[in-house]
Structure formats: C-alpha cells, structure tokens
Amino acid sequence: MSRHRLTALPLAALLALAACATPPRPEPTPVALTFTPSDQNVTNPERGFFTPVDIVTTPTNFETLRTALGYTLVRSYVRLDDYRDQDLPQTLLDDLDHALGEVRAGGVKVILRFAYNFGPYPDSEPDASREQILRHIAQLTPVLQANGDVIAWMEAGFVGAWGEWHTSTHGLHADPEAKLAIVDALLAALPGDRMIQLRYPGDIRFLIGEPLTPEAAVAATDDARARIGHHNDCFLASDSDQGTYEREGVTIDEEKAFIEDVTAYTPMGGETCQNNPPRSECPIALEELARFHYTELNASFNKLVLRSWEQGGCLAEIQKRLGYRLALEKASVNTTVRPGGIIDLTVTVRNDGFAAPVNARPLEVVLDGPSRYNVALPAVDVRLWAPGQTVTVAVRLRVPANAPAGEYRLGLWLPDAAPGLRDRLEYAIQFANVDTWDPETGLNILTPTFAVDPQAGGVVEPGTTIFAVIP
C-alpha cells in the first residue's frame, strides 16, 4: 500500500483559504424608528413671544423669565435721550456691556433697539442728527461685537419716534443717503452673522433691491442683502397695518409679496398695536403669521388683541408655532456597529413653525456612551428647513476604530454656533417630540440603545481614530 506524503501549505496560503471559507459578516441591518410629536410649547432659543425689558436700567432675573415664564427672547429699548447732541459716556457703554452679560448668564437672547425718544406721535420729541447717530453707532460697536452671541438680532432704531424710522425731527426718515449710511454703520457694528430689522418695507426695498432666495441668502457671507428683516409694530391694526404698507405709491399687495419673500430668510417680528376685528382675530392672524414667517412677537402689547386670540382659541397655537417648530418624523439606522465600522443614518424632520431658524447653527450627530463622539454635518443648513416642509437627512458615519465597546445612545445636537454658548443646554434646539429630549446633555435622542460591538458585522477601517462623515 502506497503512502501519501502530506505537504505543509505555506502559512499565507492557509490564511487565504480561511478568508475564503469565512466571508465577511454582512453590515448590520438598519432599524426603522418612529417618534411621537408633542403638543406642548417648546421653550427653544431665538423664537417665541418676547417680553419687553429695559436691560440697562431695570435689574432682571433672566433665568426666571426663561425657566418660570418660558421666554427665551427679550426686547430692550436702550434710551439715548440725554445724548442727542453729545457722545455717549463710558458709563453707559459699561452698563450696556454688563447688562448683556446678565442676559448671557440667564440663558436668553435680546432684541435691541436704540432710541432718542418715546414719541409721541405726531409731535415727537427730538432724535439726533445723522452725524451724531453715526458717532454713537461707532461708540457702541465694541460692545455689540463683544456680545453678538446674545443679540438675537437688532431693530434698526435711532431714527425718529420710538426709533421706528418715521417722524424724525432731523428729517432722516425722508433722507435716502442718511438711511443708507446708518444701515451700513449698523451692519458693520454687529458681527457679520447678525441681522437688523427695519420698520417699513419701502426702506427695505430701497436698501436691498429684490429679495434673495433662501439658498442664496444662507450662502452669502456678510452680505447686506441677506441681513435685513422686518418688524411690524402695528400688525393687523388696519388694512395697511397703520401705514406699514401702501407707502410711496406701492400697493399693499405688492409690499406684502415683497415682505413674504424677504422674511423667508430674515427675522420677522414686532407687535400688535390696536384691536381691529375681524382682521386682528384668529383666522387672519394665523394666515399672516404663517405667510410672513413670524419668529417673535410682543407678549405684552396689545392686550386686547392677545386676549381675542385666547378667546378665539389660537393663542396656544401661535405660541407653539412662532419661529421654528422642528419635529422628528422617522429615522432609519443600524443600532449596532463594530469599532471602525459604519453608521448608516437617515432622519426625516418636519417644521411645523411659522419660520425657519434665523441664525446659523450646526447639526451634529452624537454617539454618547463610554466615550462621547460628535460630528457636524457640513452639508446641512437648518436655516433652509422651511416652515411647512419635511426634510430628510441621509448620512454615513465612520465610528473610530478605538471606540470602547459598550452601550451608547445616538442623538442629534443643535447647539448655538457661538463657541461660548455651544455647551449651554438652554441655547440648544429641542425637537417637538415626546421622550426624545435629554435636558442633561441637550441631545435629541434617536435611539437610547446603540451598541458598539466588536462581534458585529460589517467592513471596518482599522486606522480611523475620529468620528467622521463618509463623503
């Protein structure tokens, strides 16, 4: 009987055979996630009813305004009556800087307006000359630049009665060159990512020409045309909103169409000023709040109008929908991953508010567990999440190969864009869903059970050390 000689195969060949015999384990299967919408008002930053506060002269507990009363915005006049003919004293600048620090400490933001009088109309107290206004803006610039993080946006102010750009005792409301110079100075005084609001559509048209598209506006870097919104301080008070519209030969319909386009990418707000049924009642109020993308409104004025909304059953809806109201609809994601493996995530979000978020902020995916990893999605701009629309975000993410095994949570984080506010929970956006918000971290939790498991399937990249978007 012959003997067969057994020949040892090289080690490399054995490994190759083993690899052929053991194919790579498949990628983990995505799981469908669903979410329950909330019917509650969500106390979110840079939106909602605001309360008027004189931040310079009136000591205010801003944290109480936010936590007990639900305000994330305050509107503050800064009165300059005593300085119509002279420079601002350093004490006033210091007081304003301190007040803005208190706003920051309390976790809210402010809508500023500088004014030299409080009317009356039509025989207003004086405002200041063009030259003095420009000098005051120059003096204020360092304070505004240093505190831009807590300035939501700024009403143009300075000119005329109440700073509303009418009834100027120096004729500035009728001086195009003065208007242009003052607006240029205001935009330069603020950080480039902050906007101003003007009282009259005609002034906005004069300054920007035709509206941009929202896509062009968010792509613009420090472009004046993308930084001028509107405040209507007599919303619903008459057919023309007490002269807000139908000025200088332009029809109401033309001006409303213009403002509808402008406010798709700029802040819109203001206040009601007198009861005017049926125009000021719920049906038309809801229609125009949505059409003109209202982000904020005065909670204190006009009381008769606000009471009519409460009696008409729409006040709670208005409170919930001022500005953005983002809600998770559904998501799909694999809930296990190997270190160095891939998370395949798709999320659908609906905006039930009247407006999109005004100021830029990142959208980040966070893997939170034995270690925390977060990555911004640079292709996503939440300012384009338009009201009434549903947006789907699909992204593939590589988990670090050195991620510790264990149980994690997967969430979305929308922090403030300012570095000093990024980790402040009160400045993060909360989705309008049940049982997704984590008040300890500011995360919107997509799934509370997500495993980093070395035994999971899928192809890995062994050298990666960061949580990253896969192009």
What are these regions (language model features)?
Residues 17-19:
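C-terminal motif of bacterial Sec signal peptides marking the signal peptidase cleavage site
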Residues 28-73, 77-79:
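Boundary/entry segment of secreted carbohydrate-active catalytic domains
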Residues 60-118, 129-133, 190, 194:
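Aromatic-lined substrate-binding rim segments of carbohydrate-active enzymes
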Residues 92-109, 126-155, 175-189:
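An active-site-proximal structural segment forming one wall of the substrate-binding cleft
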Residues 111-121, 140-173:
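Active-site groove signature of glycoside hydrolases
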Residues 153-155, 164, 168-302:
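Catalytic-core regions of glycoside hydrolase
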Residues 281-333:
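Catalytic cores of secreted or luminal carbohydrate-active enzymes
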Residues 319-471:
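Extracellular/luminal regions of secreted and cell-surface proteins that mediate adhesion/ECM remodeling
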